[in-house]
Every structure is written in structure tokens, then in C-alpha cells.
């Protein structure tokens, strides 16, 4: 009764997996003939915008009786268009996603369109989506950060996801501990800009987080995604 479509980056993939687990915990399951379709959109380029629109319309056309839920960067800045032109049932952006299961339950009861968009991403806090289900793989992605402080002229991310916010250190460590216990040999830290971790003064710098992970857990490889050379803080301390 459930189908997820995730467009764009690794962060979107991670968030879709985490949300899928929340649905599973409420008794939903995946199927080829879904009653609920969740589309996690991307808006990093004009091409990504177009693809997001096409997917939403396609799923509505092919599944006229399904509940269509749209979330992500494209819906954050285009909720009115999705409401009026794509006929989606539930629209959230890059916040309020943790409430998506409850929104679906409410829609099943009331059949009333739900739009839950917070229109000031700069005030967003880190939204914890819980721990992802254990996939059948030796590599696991762990999200540690959301948002970006760079405000590049060509990029919409700070306007759709907000400025950098860090995930609680203990939550990161707990998720990695679970993954290591399940035999994972490769952990990939991911986020919109992982080196921005800790810049919101959460009490732990990015380099401190990496050092704690390396000291606590002895697994094969620790990788870091989505960081750049102009970091505002050292990535790692000297050995």
C-alpha cells in the first residue's frame, strides 16, 4: 500500500529511507499497487524542477485513487503550483516530514488536502527522522547535517533547506553503533555540506565528531560526502 520515489541527492535518499521506516513502524508496507505514493522532490537545477513536476503528474495520472504526498526541495518553494496544477493530496517541504505518516492517517479519515509548508527556511531546526532500516549492504549512509550557509548565486539550497543545522552528536553515534553491530564495514557521513556540522554551535565540531567516531568504532572505512575545500573549520585534527 506504499510507494516511495526519491529524486536527487544522497540526502534525499537517506531521508526517504528514514521516512519509509516510520511508515513501516505504523503498519504500512511497500507494494507495486500503492494506496499512498510519497515523492521526495529535488530543485537543485531547472532540469530537476521539471523532472519533479513530471513525476508528480505521472503518478497522479497513473494512480488516480492513490494518496499523492509531495515533499522535498521542489515542494518547499512551489507548494501553490503543486496544489493547483498537480492535484497532490499532501504537500510538505523540507520540514514537517516527520508528521507525514500522521498526515496520511488524517487524510484517509477526512479526505481534506493538507499543506504544511514552513515558509522561512532560515529558522528551521534540524529535523530528526529517526534511524533508517538496516539495508542489505555493507555500506551505510548516516546523515549528520542539513542546510548550507554558502548562498551561492546558482544554488537554491539555502532557500529550500535553510542554513546549516547539525544533528545531535549522541544520535549520530547511536545510529553508527547500531550499524556497526549489524556488521557494516563502511560508514558514509552525509549532509548538504557536512563540514558545516557544528557551525550552529551545537557543542561539537565536525572534526571532534569524526575523531569520536574513529576512536569508538573500528570498522573498515569512514567516508565523508559533500564537503568542500573552503571549509570554515579544520576537517580533521593532526594525528
Language model features with spans:
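Proteins enriched for Cys/Gly/acidic motifs involved in redox and nucleic-acid/cofactor modification
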Residues: 1-197, 211, 235
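Conserved AdoMet/S-adenosylmethionine-binding subsite of the radical SAM
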Residues: 47, 51, 201-239
